[in-house]
């Protein structure tokens, strides 16, 4: 859907009346060639006494390149994306040294050091680039925003010029600002690539006005402060005072001195720097207050501070009551920054929505280097899309509560704000797991120690909170992280070793306790044996074993002199008995033949006598039956044998072969 083509011009006049700046903008526009134009209404900025008057503009001018965008910070802007203001009324305003414009308006007044804030759903500026050459409209080329400051009047110029012309007068018209209410709702839309422009980043000037290295990255928004050259025709200061030049892509608030908002009680200011290299280094003191704030320049900074706002820059909601009470400001002094931190570029791995850089764009390695004296700040943005409307509860505590002076501060946000502490010593962001960097809350250069300890898988290094940190330590976080990892491993190893030692000691203690119990029982038994010996009681062999358990084994190994006497003859075999008899020898216990014949009874065997003794057994010595007329001998036990057989037996043993009793008594 296209409307009629529009042509028009707009001018802005800035004057001082009664000590207060008054800004006005006249615009005559007719809409043409704008997608779904929506009328943007701008209220009259009438404020109380002592407050600056703001200008408003509703011009719709077609521009070919992205310049100012009040849309979503994560959206990629095409050639038709311009100053996007959906008419939403918020309480945040764009602050300056007495000038500014309220959100919901497309007017712009930047005579001096500025505080910029967006007005869309994300409340951030997506692409803001001041002091750059760019094409605006059809066939027109401007030298960017020319800011002049005079003692009696201030003007903001962005007039249409050719490449050879530059603005030089004390006043100029405000032109080339286009606004469109068509918002890019689809994230990840590819942005238009321009010659000398990094993908979704800053423009490269053709006249060398911005010759210092611009921090660039491949993300949907950016924030950079660059130092223009001293001889740039775009930077003109009639009063001889240094004027700031800001290049803003992330829409974060950048200020060197800002007034409190007329309608917001809370003001959050980001660090700002004057960008004139001819002036001595100066610093900015940061002020975070509840009802109002003033930023004072107190601490020295070495040089300009280019700010890099990576990933999806989200708005920081500043809410509160409409009353503008005077609160007690909390001044935060930024310590001396490191001088040896070089520029780094955000590549395609910096965000899940980031795309690779085009071939015609500037690569991260082709970008000009930042001055070695320029510290680099990195601000991870919040991934949340809707701004949090809770009040901020800032508390600023040092790493050491008892430390005073210029010690590094550790501001921490309250639970309702969801904003982590601002660390004073920036360090590098490791490329590992950079897709999760967007989860870090806004206004946090790096997550605090509490969040680091809560997320163990995080790749961001821990920042020290002690009194001071040297530049070498800040420049080499990888070595410190590796050393800390090794120290943690060493501590864990020592802890495990101590636990093992503790378990070993516990086991040893139990064994010693058991040994002590056994020894106590042994001592008691020895005492009982000794007392029994004193009483003269008969002691058993076990009683003697109490004194020494080895006594029994020694006694078993001793030579037994009566071993042969203790032989178990009854259980021996016949062979063993023969061997034993041969070894022992013959022991004659028998009787002589004369004694046997004299004492032993003899008679003849007859068959009549055999009939009466039918149960008569044969001779036990020779095992033969008795025959008629054989000589038989009768022993004292009554057993009968052949006389020749029994006489030989009795000569060996005086024992009865049957009953083993004494055969003959002499």
Swiss-Prot record:
EC supergroup of this enzyme: transferase
Functional description taken from the UniProt entry: E3 ubiquitin-protein ligase that functions as a regulator of MED25 stability by targeting MED25 for degradation in a RING-H2-dependent way. Proteasome-dependent degradation of MED25 seems to activate its function as positive regulator of FLOWERING LOCUS T (FT) and is important to induce the expression of FT and consequently to promote flowering. May function downstream of HAL3 and be required for HAL3-regulated plant growth. Activation of MBR2 by HAL3 may lead to the degradation of cell cycle suppressors, resulting in enhancement of cell division and plant growth.
Annotated pathway: Protein modification; protein ubiquitination
Record Gene3D superfamilies: Zinc/RING finger domain, C3HC4 (zinc finger) (3.30.40.10)
Entry GO MF terms: ubiquitin protein ligase activity; zinc ion binding
Source species, domain of life: Eukaryota
Residues covered by region (Disordered): 1-58, 73-95, 155-179, 221-329, 400-433, 457-491
EC number: 2.3.2.27
Record remark on domains: The RING-type zinc finger domain mediates binding to an E2 ubiquitin-conjugating enzyme.
Gene: MBR2
Designated name of the protein: E3 ubiquitin-protein ligase MBR2
SMART domains: RING
């Amino acid at each position: 859907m296209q409307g009629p083509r529009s042509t028009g011009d707009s001018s802005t006049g800035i004057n001082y009346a009664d000590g207060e700046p008054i800004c006005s903008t006249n615009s005559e526009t007719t809409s043409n060639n704008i997608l779904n134009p929506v009328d943007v209404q701008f209220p009259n900025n009438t404020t109380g006494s002592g407050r600056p008057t703001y200008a408003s503009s509703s011009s719709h001018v077609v521009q070919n390149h992205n310049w100012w965008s009040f849309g979503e910070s994560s959206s990629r802007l095409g050639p038709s994306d311009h100053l996007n203001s959906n008419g939403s009324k918020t309480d945040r305003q764009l602050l300056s040294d007495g000038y500014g414009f309220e959100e919901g308006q497309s007017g712009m007044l930047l005579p001096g050091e500025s505080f910029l804030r967006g007005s869309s759903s994300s409340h951030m500026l997506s692409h803001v680039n001041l002091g750059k050459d760019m094409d605006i409209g059809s066939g027109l080329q401007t030298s960017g925003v020319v800011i002049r400051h005079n003692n009696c009047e201030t003007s903001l110029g962005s007039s249409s010029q050719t490449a050879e012309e530059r603005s030089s007068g004390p006043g100029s018209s405000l032109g080339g600002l286009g606004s469109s209410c068509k918002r890019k709702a689809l994230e990840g839309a590819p942005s238009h690539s321009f010659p000398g422009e990094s993908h979704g980043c800053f423009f490269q000037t053709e006249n060398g006005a911005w010759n210092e290295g611009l921090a660039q990255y491949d993300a949907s928004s950016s924030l950079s402060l660059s130092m223009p050259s001293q001889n740039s025709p775009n930077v003109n200061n009639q009063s001889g005072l240094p004027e700031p030049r800001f290049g803003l892509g992330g829409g974060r608030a950048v200020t060197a001195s800002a007034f409190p908002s007329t309608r917001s009680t809370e003001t959050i200011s980001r660090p700002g720097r004057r960008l004139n290299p001819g002036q001595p280094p100066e610093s900015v003191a940061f002020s975070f207050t509840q009802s109002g704030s003033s930023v004072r320049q107190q601490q020295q900074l070495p040089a300009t501070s280019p700010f890099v706002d990576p990933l999806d820059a989200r708005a920081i909601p500043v809410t509160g009551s409409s009353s503008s009470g005077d609160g007690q400001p909390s001044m935060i002094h930024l310590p001396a920054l490191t001088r040896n931190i070089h520029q780094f570029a955000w590549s395609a791995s910096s965000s899940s929505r980031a795309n690779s850089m085009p071939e015609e764009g500037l690569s991260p390695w082709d970008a000009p280097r930042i001055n070695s004296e320029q510290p680099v700040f990195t601000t991870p943005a919040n991934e949340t899309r809707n701004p949090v409307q809770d009040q901020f509860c800032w508390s600023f505590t040092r790493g050491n509560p008892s430390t005073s002076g210029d010690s590094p501060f550790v501001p921490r946000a309250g639970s309702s704000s969801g904003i982590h502490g601002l660390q004073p010593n920036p360090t590098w962001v490791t490329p590992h797991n950079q897709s999760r960097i967007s989860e870090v809350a806004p206004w946090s250069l790096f997550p605090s120690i509490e969040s680091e300890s809560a997320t163990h898988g995080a790749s961001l290094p821990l920042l020290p909170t002690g009194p001071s940190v040297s530049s070498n330590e800040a420049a080499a976080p990888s070595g410190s992280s590796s050393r800390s990892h090794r120290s943690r491993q060493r501590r864990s190893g020592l802890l495990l070793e101590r636990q093992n030692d503790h378990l070993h000691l516990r086991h040893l203690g139990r064994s010693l306790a058991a040994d002590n119990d056994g020894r106590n029982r042994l001592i008691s038994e020895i005492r009982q044996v000794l007392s029994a010996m004193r009483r003269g009681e008969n002691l058993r062999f076990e009683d003697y074993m109490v004194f020494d358990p080895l006594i029994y084994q020694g006694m078993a190994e001793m030579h037994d002199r009566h071993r042969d006497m203790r032989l178990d003859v009854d259980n021996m075999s016949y062979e063993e008995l023969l061997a034993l008899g041969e070894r022992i020898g013959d022991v004659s216990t028998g009787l002589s033949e004369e004694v046997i014949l004299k004492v032993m009874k003899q008679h003849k065997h007859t068959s009549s006598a055999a009939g009466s003794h039918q149960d008569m057994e044969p001779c036990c010595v020779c095992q033969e039956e008795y025959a008629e007329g054989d000589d038989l001998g009768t022993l004292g036990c009554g057993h009968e044998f052949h006389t020749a057989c029994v006489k030989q037996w009795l000569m060996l043993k005086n024992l009865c072969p049957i009953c083993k009793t004494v055969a003959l008594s002499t």
